[in-house]
Design a protein with these regions (language model features):
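Conserved active-site alpha-helix within GNAT-family acetyltransferase domains
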Residues: 65, 77, 89-107
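Hydrophobic adenine-recognition pocket in adenosine-nucleotide-binding enzymes
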Residues: 52-54, 87, 141
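C-terminal "cap" of GNAT-fold acetyltransferases
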Residues: 42-43, 101, 108-135
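Conserved beta-strand-loop-alpha-helix junction that forms the acyl-donor binding cleft
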Residues: 59, 85-95, 113
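A short, well-structured alpha-helix characteristic of acyl/acetyltransferase catalytic modules
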Residues: 2-7, 125-177
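Acetyl-CoA-dependent GNAT
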Residues: 1-50, 55, 68-69, 111, ...
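Conserved GNAT acetyl-CoA-binding A-motif
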Residues: 68, 75-87
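Conserved acetyl-CoA-binding loop-helix of GNAT-fold acetyltransferases
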Residues: 54, 60-73, 96, 100
Length: 220
């Protein structure tokens, strides 16, 4: 725990100035996850929560779930939308928590003591922000949005070609994933993000923002 804190990864939930939950919130990667690298949805940066513990008197009050949800908020602020976690096969409480948070099972990993653990992953959806027009919101695109983005581009290819010269290089969902990958791999404060405009749950627009080049601040 001392090392967690020194690394800046130790987080707590407090009640009346008393620590009631502790866990590691890390973005440094987990080497054992390479054991199943082909079973994750992508190889972009991810959030991990380890060593989650709740004070005895606060158990069964949703404190662990609140910790996980707050960790998700930390991750969103960093523009990291992958969340991975693992637990022992006999940790029924953690398995129920993971299930309640809609994680997907990805495979089995082994730590140095050769104990098998179940590994899970979920995609965090960026928060949608209203734009002042009823029913319309905007949010950052994630890697998992490649399919709906490609579908929208393919339907409007002729219109897009006039101002998006590289549109004809996007011929498949894989091409769109390849386009999004380096954007989402870039630290949030340095990235040129792609945003999705939505009406209710339907995509109705895309916007690309260029911030990395001080001489070329523009919107597409």
């Amino acid at each position: 725990i001392r090392q967690d804190i020194q690394d800046g990864n130790g987080y707590v939930i407090c009640r009346e100035n008393r620590v009631v939950a502790y866990g590691v919130v890390s973005f440094d990667g987990e080497p054992v996850y390479e054991q199943i690298k082909d079973q994750w949805s992508n190889d972009l940066p991810y959030l991990i929560v380890h060593r989650l513990a709740v004070a005895d008197e606060m158990k069964r009050q949703g404190m662990a779930k609140q910790f996980m949800l707050q960790a998700e908020e930390v991750s969103r602020r960093k523009g990291i939308y992958n969340f991975r976690v693992d637990t022992k096969y006999d940790n029924a409480y953690m398995l129920r928590l993971i299930d309640s948070l809609n994680f997907n099972y990805c495979g089995e990993v082994y730590y140095r003591n050769n104990s098998a653990r179940k590994a899970f992953e979920k995609t965090l959806r960026p928060h949608s922000n209203p734009i002042g027009v009823p029913g319309y919101t905007i949010r950052e695109a994630t890697y998992e949005d490649a399919g709906i983005i490609f579908e929208a581009i393919d339907k409007n290819r002729d219109d897009l070609r006039t101002w998006l010269p590289f549109v004809d290089s996007l011929q498949s969902v894989a091409d769109e994933q390849q386009f999004l990958h380096p954007i989402l791999a870039t630290p949030y404060e340095k990235r040129d993000p792609v945003f999705i405009l939505e009406h209710d749950t339907d995509i109705c627009g895309l916007a690309g923002f260029h911030f990395s080049d001080p001489s070329n601040h523009r919107t597409e």
